[in-house]
């Protein structure tokens, strides 16, 4: 309950920001540039594998093929991404369940659009740790990116799946890979939730890690099967006013998703990851091998509902699939 209250407070703050931003932009009609291309402001995370399909769609000219030119608007947080979309400063944006679904639950007219990104999280401990099983985490300190965020929710789900009381551990905010590493080295935390890119980065610095569970290798149980980490979003108003633009965006992203899934593109994809993440060729290869099949161009209603319940609470029916997920993109 405390976690949900903390998160809802963040959502309320984000929605307040959105109300302020609404005066600065309009999401009703897409503009056209001098070349006749539709201009689309897209909210994005920079230097993050979560939006890799967007990177590839731009690099491969897939948006231009659909008559679209994108203006990337980078944000510092997922809450900011959702707020700027609602406020009209962007027309499409990557979203995370914790913010988008909560905003939908608060009555915001948002629509989820493909591609849908599989949850990429592992619960890891230092290689020399005596901890070898999730059950041994009872009473321990677990690192999460930030309190009340999806990484904490993931940890809670994994603990519960393994018979450990989620309230019986201490959650410690450790940030991303750069600040996560010293928290592990110093013993500030016994374990931490980390994405593939963070694990690869930390290992490259000489700190061995072992995964107790990992969504990318099937060891995370049910949450690894159905969990979503990202999807793309627009507003009902923009979709209704610009259906062809939304379809064009979605088609370009679907082509990018298929390009990434095809391992024949590994070398080119690695070069893109090197540039995106500022990592070595070797590390880019490790990341590619883990994540390149992480995105899907569709989602079933059952999977959507499971993510709603994981995010908003068991039994939640306030964000129905039919009203909030675009299924027309192929």
Q: PLM ranges: what are they?
A:
Residues 65, 214-225, 293-301:
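Short, solvent-exposed loop/beta-turn-alpha elements that line the ligand-binding surface or hinge
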């Amino acid at each position: 309950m405390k976690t949900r209250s903390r998160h809802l407070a963040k959502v309320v703050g984000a929605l307040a920001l959105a109300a302020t931003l609404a005066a600065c932009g309009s999401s009703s009609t897409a503009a056209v540039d001098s070349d006749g291309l539709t201009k689309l402001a897209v909210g994005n995370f920079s230097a993050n594998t979560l939006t890799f399909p967007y990177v590839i769609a731009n690099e491969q000219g897939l948006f231009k093929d659909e008559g679209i030119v994108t203006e990337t608007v980078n944000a510092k947080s997922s809450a900011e991404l959702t707020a700027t979309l609602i406020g009209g400063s962007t027309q499409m944006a990557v979203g995370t369940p914790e913010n988008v679904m909560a905003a939908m639950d608060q009555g915001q007219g948002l629509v989820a659009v493909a591609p849908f990104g599989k949850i990429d999280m592992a619960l890891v401990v230092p290689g020399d740790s005596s901890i070898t099983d999730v059950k041994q985490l009872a009473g321990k300190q677990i690192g999460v990116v930030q309190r009340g965020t999806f990484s904490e929710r993931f940890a809670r789900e994994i603990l519960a799946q393994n018979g450990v009381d989620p309230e019986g551990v201490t959650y410690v905010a450790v940030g991303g890979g750069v600040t996560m590493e010293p928290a592990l080295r110093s013993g500030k935390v016994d374990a931490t939730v980390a994405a593939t890119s963070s694990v690869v980065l930390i290992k490259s610095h000489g700190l061995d890690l072992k995964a107790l569970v990992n969504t990318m290798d099937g060891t995370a149980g049910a949450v690894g099967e159905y969990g979503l980490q990202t999807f793309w979003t627009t507003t009902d108003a923009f979709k209704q006013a610009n259906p062809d633009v939304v379809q064009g965006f979605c088609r370009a992203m679907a082509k990018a998703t298929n390009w990434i899934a095809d391992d024949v593109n590994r070398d080119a994809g690695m070069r893109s990851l090197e540039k995106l993440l500022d990592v070595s060729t070797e590390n880019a290869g490790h990341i590619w091998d883990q994540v390149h099949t992480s995105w899907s161009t569709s989602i079933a209603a059952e999977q959507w509902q499971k993510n709603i319940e994981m995010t908003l609470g068991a039994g939640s029916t306030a964000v129905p699939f039919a009203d909030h997920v675009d299924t027309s993109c192929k």
